[in-house]
Every structure is written in C-alpha cells, then in structure tokens.
Amino acid sequence: MANEIVYVSSLAPFIEGLTKEKRSCGFKYHRQAYLLKDFDDYWLDNDYKETVLTPENLEGWLQQKENEGTGYLRNRIGVVIELAKYLNGLGYKSYIPKVEARYEVPIRHILTNQELKELFYQIDSYKPDTSDKDFVRMAEEYPILFRVLYHLGMRIQETCSLSMSQVDLEKGVFTILDGKGNKDRLVYLSDDMTSLCKVYVEYLTRILGESPKWFFPGKKSETHISVPAVRATFNALWKKTSFANTCNKKPTVHDLRHTYTTERINKWAEQGISFKEMLPYLSKQLGHKSYQETNYYYHIVEDAYNVIHEKDKTSSEVIPEVKRR
C-alpha cells in the first residue's frame, strides 16, 4: 500500500507533504507515490543532501533508461515536476524540468450531427442474430450506454465498470471512483438523462428478476459489460452507416467523448461564454488531472469549427429518444 512507503532522503518531509496534499484534494496518488520512492532512492544513491532541485542534481533522473518506454519516462519526470512546484510554493527555489518526451497526438474524428443521427439510428435499431435472452438484454443496454458516453463525455472503462452503488438516480449523479488520474469525481446527469436511466433500471430489474449489480451487466449479469464488446459493437454499427466508407478517419468509441467536449466548447462560444471561465468545470466533469489536458480540446475545436457547423442544435434534436422494444 502507498501509505506504507517510507521516504528517507533529505527530501522525505517534502515528498510526504506533497503526497498528503494531493490526497487531501481527492487524488489517490498511489502510482505517483511509488515513483517518488524511486526518486527518493535516486537522491540517496547520489548522496544528495540539499532540499532544492537543480538541473545538475536532476540530470541523472531525467535521462531515459535503456528499454524504458516514453510513457514511463514522462511519468517519472511528471512527479518531479509536481515536487518542484511544491518546493517552490514553500520557498525552496527549485528547477522545474520540461517533459521532452512527447506522444504523437492522434487525429480525432469529431462526429457531425448527421453522423451522430445515423450512428444512433443503428444503435437503437440493433437486434442480435440470436434469441438468447442475455444478448437480447444487452441490445437494450447499448442505446443507454452509448448515450452515457456521448451526453456525459465519460471514458469507456469507467462507463462499463459502473456499479449500481455508484448510481444515484434520485439526485441524478454518477460517482466515478478512482478514475484515470487516480481521482474520484461526480458526474451530473440532465433531467432527461436521469429519467431515461430510471426507465432503463426498471427494465433491467424486471428482466434479471433482481436488482442489478452493474449498471451495464455483461452476458453474465454478475460481471459488467466488457470494453472489447462495446468497441466491437460500436465498430459493427458504424460500418452500417452511410459514412463508413467515405470518412478519412474511422471514429472510435472514445471519439464520442471528444465530440461531447467539442460541442460543449462550441456551444459556449455561441453563447459568448469564455472558455477560460468554464475550464475548471469542464476539467472536473471529464476527470482530467490538469487543466492542460482540457486545453487540448480548445485546439480540437479550432480545427473542427467548420465540421460541426450546426453548433446551435441541442443534442436532443440530434439524438432521438430511446424507444423500448
């Protein structure tokens, strides 16, 4: 467990202070705590006694190790950046390193209104090629699941693994536990989405003959629906749209999240609302660990401005209501 980690270098009190501060803000900070233990060992191994970070005493830490992936290197540097900021805040002037290792940003497919209409038509019309009652039930889950992904901008993993204990439909809230970035958060549903989910849960309870454990049960109801199953279904249904063979970049399930975010920013622009004002709220809704992650979408919007040209349409006009079969 992260709370059993013992730091012993001259930076130990500051590392402990940083981890406590992060956890008090709601971050789990488990993986980062172990990386900081590695940094604590690095500090000891080099016999550093100082309590400030400099380019010189960080040189060895910032080097990419043999067979070390870019992602892990970024994580190692990232915790030191956080520590440097923490030290600076306490008056210990420290060097803040730059993350030189970069990922190539993937091209995203921001779905247009017409693409969304066709996609959700296929989702709502989907019927399995079998009369198996569990596959029939799952066909009823997909319209809700994909609406949750699109209307709430949630990640696919946290959506699939949503348990009923995390769902409060009286308050219209999902509690996302230990999401990406190791931070819990609340996701608020609109009144329409809340009503839709209530009807859906009533359906699940009736079909299963008991209160469901998972909001999106898999074929075996004691387990949640799998991410590969959702991706495969999305791909199969996208292929049935008229856009499948005409778009340059095939969309993924995750692009529903990108489309949600892009539409929110465009809507604010139409209403004259500053993106900077809304940035903290959007960042919290998406579960980002930093505003920099959310800022990424601002550039997507600039690139996709001409693609999503009907920005004033509400999602309810684009996505039809779910009809129970």
Task: Please give the residue ranges for each predicted region.
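Conserved catalytic core of the tyrosine transesterase superfamily
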Residues: 1-325
